[in-house]
């Protein structure tokens, strides 16, 4: 007879871990206890050496599906004899905290939901140890019902019996509930509740109405994705003329009908996180054009909450569409609504009916958006199902840091030692409501993770709201340059701490020289960077308008490339009028609302304008995306199909310059010659990749650094990503890219937290 104390660290709370341990131990004839300690699960296992060994083997090799084991330690324990194996009350201990994300409804709960003989028949909140809300309802750790919003709903006797019975799937399931216990769904401003409310919602959808639906992490706005007039009306109400809308399809069969996808995408669609996955549309699909206009892809997710399943499958005699638009329930720029008060104040004007429920949401959680690249996940927005799973590094860092993140697509990051907890998506910080949401989320996550940051890190921009927030925290503050933070985020995700050649391409960021950066090649390590190369600067004229109207950038670059004949060329190609050219030239010369820029994002906008694809954008990245889609229509091998340009790079004051004026000039010549726009779009991508790779090779030869890191929102363009990566690898360089941390500003906070301040 031996007794061992076993501690298991990782995602072991909220995933049915203690019931799993109890069942395994009992089956092996072991006695003892298992308890949550907040930062780990502690097991006392008493029995034969063989049985204890088999339990440890089960913990290591076949833990519950949703668990993530990071470390197991064990030691001999002197304990009196135990009579049985029990789950005992949780106790708080100091240490690393691992919080489970929200988990999509499992297959067993799906079956029970529609089983008329089951007491949870049609219960919109059915869950078990393998599924249900976690992060969004959690008030503090350890994860027990009394520390969640489910404390508002005392268990009925039947639920309590299952909760305490090791033989059931709901043994120790903290959010366990049923139709007796609550919560319940209802239509705001109506007497309709429960099944009646769901039927009324379905009827409204089929009548072409727009509905607000409260889910796990906040509200969605939804309508029939096959109803063109309903989708157009939703766009008008949200002032969202062209940005793609996500759709929720009833099941994988509906997804196959609408889209082409492979095994990797199917695993993402059907996995327990249930993100929105970007898929190629089929021409034979039935989704209306307004869902994702002029876009070959559409964001698709499958139902992940029981309420979603009821909307599609509740057999109440109402014929229901199998395709719903599901877009975030928020005012443009504001955070997603999470309460009835939010919904009534902010989105009631966008919808005809609000289907809500009385389970409180403590932490907002938007849907995660996922793409794929080279057979692996390539995340665009990291939120529900993934946050706040920590990014682990082997650096052995000490202390705690709060990183505030970027101004756009904001997330924040809490570092505890070598664990980096990247938050759910917060939003764009221009709106004061989003700043308030950031403040609330930081406070709650610090409490949840028992974090007491010793310092704070933020961006360098003097006018960002995130910077003002960081400066008001009364903590030692360090400001990290935006594009350097991008590269650091890629290094952190890949657990790489040595020097890299970082290619950081995005739309904007405040440079150390006070100009706009965005097309940077940096020599980086964790302690600092050197600007080795960049896009050749151009004038960005018109303030905020210049980030939306690519013709302005095209005019400036073409004018620089052609000199005195620039105005004539621009007018001939329809880039701008003679009057507009003269006005912009004067503004640039006198530096009126004009600033020097090296933005790769604006370069893409300029190329799109020159080719007559998009002169302006109604949402971030619209013109650049249209350029990418045009290029992807031209299917050729990326190497050796164009006559090389005379000069791809130059040097000025020790900095390599990518000759983008020559690149825009090439596009202008192509348009004058009547060449195919798709071919020219592809050539733009190819030549920019050539320039980038050539610059990296030169830097590598000079410094001996053989590793490159690619980050920044422009690398969401998978065509450019593939071209640059392939060229660098052909040169013998190792390339680090993102996977489960966004390349865009949603990953900035991780990079800020990874910065090693040696002061």
Model regions: which residues?
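Intrinsically disordered, low-complexity, mixed-charge
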Residues: 1-175, 179-182
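A contiguous, well-structured pocket-lining segment that forms one wall/lid of small-molecule binding clefts
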Residues: 160, 175, 182-184, 406-444, ...
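Internal gly/pro-rich beta-alpha loop/helix module
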Residues: 62, 162, 316, 320-395, ...
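Conserved phosphate-binding catalytic cores of ATP/NTP-utilizing and phosphoryl-transfer enzymes
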Residues: 256-261, 310, 336-343, 367-368, ...
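Glycine-rich phosphate-binding/hydrolytic loop that grips phosphoryl groups
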Residues: 483-505, 509-511, 550-559, 686, ...
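Conserved phosphate-binding/catalytic loops in two-lobed NTP-binding clefts
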Residues: 459, 474-486, 707-711, 718, ...
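A phosphate-binding glycine/aspartate-rich beta-alpha loop in the early core of alpha/beta enzymes
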Residues: 76, 218-281
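Short glycine-rich phosphate-binding loop at a beta-alpha junction
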Residues: 212, 450-462, 703-714
């Amino acid at each position: 007879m031996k007794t061992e104390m076993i501690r298991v660290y990782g995602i072991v709370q909220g995933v049915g871990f203690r019931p799993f341990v109890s069942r395994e131990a009992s089956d092996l004839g072991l006695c003892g206890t298992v308890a949550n300690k907040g930062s780990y699960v502690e097991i006392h296992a008493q029995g034969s050496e063989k049985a204890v060994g088999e339990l440890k083997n089960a913990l290591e090799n076949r833990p519950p599906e949703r668990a993530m084991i990071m470390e197991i330690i064990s030691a001999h324990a002197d304990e009196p004899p135990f009579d049985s194996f029990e789950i005992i009350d949780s106790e708080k201990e100091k240490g690393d905290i691992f919080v489970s994300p929200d988990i999509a409804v499992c297959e067993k709960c799906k079956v029970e939901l529609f089983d008329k003989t089951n007491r949870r028949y049609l219960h919109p909140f059915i869950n078990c140890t393998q599924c249900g809300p976690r992060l969004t309802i959690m008030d503090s750790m350890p994860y027990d019902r009394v520390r969640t919003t489910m404390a508002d709903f005392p268990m009925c006797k039947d639920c309590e019996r299952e909760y305490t019975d090791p033989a059931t799937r709901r043994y120790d399931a903290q959010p366990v509930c049923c139709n007796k216990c609550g919560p319940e769904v209802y239509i705001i401003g109506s007497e309709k509740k429960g099944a009646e409310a769901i039927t009324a919602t379905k009827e409204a959808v089929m009548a072409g109405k727009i509905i607000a639906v409260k889910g796990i992490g906040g509200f969605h706005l939804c309508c029939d994705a096959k109803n063109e007039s309903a989708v157009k009306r939703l766009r008008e109400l949200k002032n969202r003329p062209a940005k793609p809308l996500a759709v929720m399809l009833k099941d994988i069969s509906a997804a196959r009908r609408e889209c082409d996808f492979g095994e990797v995408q199917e695993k993402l669609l059907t996995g327990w996180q249930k993100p929105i996955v970007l898929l190629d549309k089929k021409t034979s699909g039935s989704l209306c054009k307004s869902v994702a206009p002029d876009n070959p892809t559409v964001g698709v997710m499958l139902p992940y909450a029981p309420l979603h399943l009821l909307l599609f499958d509740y057999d109440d005699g109402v014929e229901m569409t199998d395709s719903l638009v599901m877009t975030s329930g928020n005012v443009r720029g504001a955070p997603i609504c999470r309460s009835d008060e939010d919904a009534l104040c902010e989105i009631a004007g966008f919808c005809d009916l609000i289907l809500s429920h009385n389970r409180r949401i403590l932490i907002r959680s938007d849907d995660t958006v996922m793409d794929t690249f080279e057979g692996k996940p390539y995340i665009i927005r990291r939120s529900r199902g993934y946050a706040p799973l920590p990014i682990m590094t082997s650096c052995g860092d000490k202390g705690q840091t709060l990183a505030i993140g970027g101004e756009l697509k904001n997330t924040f990051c809490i570092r505890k030692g070598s664990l980096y907890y990247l938050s759910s998506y917060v939003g764009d910080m221009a709106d004061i409501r989003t700043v308030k949401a950031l403040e609330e989320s930081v406070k709650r996550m610090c409490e949840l993770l028992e974090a007491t940051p010793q310092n704070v890190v933020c961006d360098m921009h003097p006018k960002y709201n995130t910077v003002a927030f960081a400066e008001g925290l009364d903590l030692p503050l360090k400001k990290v340059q935006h594009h350097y933070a991008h590269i650091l985020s890629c290094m952190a995700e890949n657990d790489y701490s040595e020097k890299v050649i970082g290619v950081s391409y995005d739309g904007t960021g405040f440079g150390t020289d006070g100009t706009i950066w965005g097309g940077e090649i940096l020599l980086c390590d964790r302690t600092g960077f050197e600007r080795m190369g960049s896009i050749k600067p151009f004038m960005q004229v018109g303030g905020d308008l210049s980030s939306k109207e690519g013709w302005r950038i095209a005019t400036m670059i073409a004018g620089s490339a052609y000199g005195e004949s620039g105005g004539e060329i621009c007018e001939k190609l329809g880039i701008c009028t003679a009057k507009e050219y003269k006005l912009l030239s004067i503004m640039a010369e006198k530096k009126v609302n004009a600033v020097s820029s090296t933005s790769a994002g604006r370069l893409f906008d300029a190329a799109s304008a020159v080719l007559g694809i998009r002169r302006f954008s109604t949402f971030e990245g619209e013109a650049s995306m249209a350029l990418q889609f045009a290029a992807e229509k031209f299917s050729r091998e990326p190497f050796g199909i164009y006559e090389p340009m005379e000069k791809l790079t130059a040097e000025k004051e020790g900095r390599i310059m990518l000759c983008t004026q020559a690149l825009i000039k090439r596009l202008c010549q192509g348009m004058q010659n009547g060449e195919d726009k798709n071919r020219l779009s592809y050539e733009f991508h190819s030549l920019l990749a050539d320039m980038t790779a050539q610059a990296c090779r030169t830097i590598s030869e000079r410094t001996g650094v053989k590793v490159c890191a690619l980050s920044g929102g422009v690398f969401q363009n998978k065509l450019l990503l593939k071209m640059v990566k392939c060229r660098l690898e052909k040169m013998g360089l190792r390339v680090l890219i993102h996977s489960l941390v966004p390349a865009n500003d949603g990953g900035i906070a991780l990079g800020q937290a990874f910065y090693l301040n040696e002061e």
